[in-house]
């Protein structure tokens, strides 16, 4: 075992490890062993040659530590952080910020966003790691003060790829000038507004706002999130990467990273309208991808999430595009409880089919091709309904089961009846893409 996922670059495997860790935490999955095996087969320099590469793994190990508190994961993360801090922060070009690689002084957005987020993710562990209480927080504040003044955030509240400077050894793009940095030598290069640049910053700002009690930082995050879901989309409000349909393997991961961090942002918000807007966006994208963008030949997902592209088996699909889709599904599952109407008499029990403590199922009325709204409304009208579960499957496939104590003769018209032994619902079988809702008595 190499510690890397098949057909992925090194940094991508670090990103996918965070995706897997989120999946494990969601379902208490036995795949937890993969985290340990990955750790044993990698080191702090796994992933690539640049400082952004290392930090994807840093974040993955911190997420792994939150699921399984193995101190070796935490120590690996802080070792990466210390290496990046010593070698990447550079005041001589653009007045600060971390550069892309040891031999490339380009100041790009993602490397600096990752540095902000890494420090905020490490901040709660400062004492455990033998650092001063504000050590990581101070670095995060220093990074954000530089980032905000750098000109990376353009007039549309979107973040471009990086900065241009005549003093830089090299850079990835020099596409124009917009927004001058505070030292007067660097400007926004007007590079592509990749979706992941709009995503990682959201969690960094949310954590920084929470630590400093500065709500202005949340306002920044909301402006970036709003601009993304308004501008980087197809006409059907489905997220769009600027490179589509001709994205390379790096770029195929970007949308998954955005929605993951949009989901991370939501718990820190207090504005109900924004919460509902973001939850709705995630849910709509997830339903579209799950029902129309999976290739039935190999189970892989297309890089294009909009169903305006009719070929789900196009040549763009691979491990990277599928990893992004799983980020979307996990984000949808984590935000699902907040999407239920506050007036509802139902509470989300978890992912999977509804069952009792013995693993038995209740009798149910069931029907195929039923939306969740119809499923819930029909269950509401059944006085004997105890719970319902709704499943999304292959293209066009949605399935509703109303777990009920009602007489089979009193079922809704057009629905089938299945008899089973259980008489209550207490848990789920944790099946992905299915959600169980329990009636609130």
Show which residues each predicted segment covers.
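Active-site cradle of extracellular carbohydrate-active enzymes
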Residues: 112-119, 133-208, 228
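Asp-box/WD-like beta-propeller blade repeats and closely related beta-sheet repeat scaffolds
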Residues: 78-108
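CBM-like carbohydrate-recognition segments
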Residues: 1-52, 56, 64-67, 73, ...
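Residue-level signature of alpha-solenoid helical repeat scaffolds
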Residues: 18, 59, 79, 117, ...
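Extracellular disulfide-rich cysteine clusters
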Residues: 341-441
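Acidic/His metal-coordination segments adjacent to aromatic residues that form catalytic metal sites
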Residues: 39-44, 98-101, 165-188, 233-245
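Inter-helical turn/loop segments and adjacent helix faces that build the functional surface
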Residues: 68, 122-135, 208-212
């Amino acid at each position: 075992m190499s510690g890397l996922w098949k057909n992925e670059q090194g940094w991508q495997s670090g990103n996918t490890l965070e995706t897997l860790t989120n999946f494990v935490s969601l379902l208490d999955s036995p795949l937890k062993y993969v985290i340990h095996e990955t750790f044993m087969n990698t080191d702090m320099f796994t992933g690539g040659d640049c400082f952004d590469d290392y930090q994807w793994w840093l974040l993955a190990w911190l997420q792994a530590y939150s699921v399984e508190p193995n101190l070796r994961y935490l120590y690996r993360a802080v070792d990466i952080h210390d290496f990046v801090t010593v070698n990447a922060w550079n005041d001589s070009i653009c007045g600060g910020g971390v550069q892309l690689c040891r031999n490339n002084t380009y100041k790009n957005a993602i490397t600096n966003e990752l540095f902000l987020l890494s420090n905020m993710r490490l901040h709660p562990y400062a004492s455990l790691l033998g650092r001063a209480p504000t050590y990581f927080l101070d670095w995060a504040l220093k990074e954000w003060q530089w980032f905000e003044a750098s000109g990376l955030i353009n007039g549309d509240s979107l973040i471009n790829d990086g900065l241009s400077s005549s003093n830089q050894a090299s850079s990835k793009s020099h596409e124009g000038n917009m927004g001058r940095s505070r030292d007067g030598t660097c400007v926004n290069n007007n590079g592509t507004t990749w979706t992941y640049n709009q995503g990682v910053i959201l969690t960094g700002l949310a954590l920084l706002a929470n630590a400093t009690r500065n709500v202005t930082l949340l306002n920044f995050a909301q402006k970036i999130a709003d601009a993304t879901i308004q501008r980087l989309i197809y006409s059907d409000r489905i997220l769009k990467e600027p490179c589509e349909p001709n994205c390379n393997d790096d770029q195929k991961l970007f949308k998954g990273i955005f929605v993951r961090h949009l989901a991370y942002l939501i718990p820190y918000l207090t504005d109900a309208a924004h919460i509902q807007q973001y939850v709705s966006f995630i849910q709509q994208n997830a339903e579209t991808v799950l029902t129309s963008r999976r290739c039935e030949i190999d189970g892989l997902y297309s890089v294009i999430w909009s169903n305006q592209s009719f070929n789900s088996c196009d040549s763009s699909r691979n491990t990277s595009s599928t990893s992004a889709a799983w980020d979307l599904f996990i984000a949808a599952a984590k935000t699902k409880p907040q999407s239920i109407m506050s007036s509802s008499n139902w509470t989300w029990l978890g992912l999977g089919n509804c069952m009792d403590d013995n693993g038995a199922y209740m009798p149910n009325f069931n029907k195929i091709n039923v939306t969740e709204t119809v499923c819930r409304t029909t269950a509401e009208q059944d006085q004997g309904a105890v719970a319902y579960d709704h499943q999304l499957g292959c293209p066009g496939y949605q399935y509703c089961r109303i777990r009920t104590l009602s007489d089979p003769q009193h079922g809704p018209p057009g629905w089938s009846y299945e008899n089973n032994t259980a008489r209550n619902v207490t848990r789920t079988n944790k099946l992905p893409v299915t959600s169980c809702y329990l009636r609130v008595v």
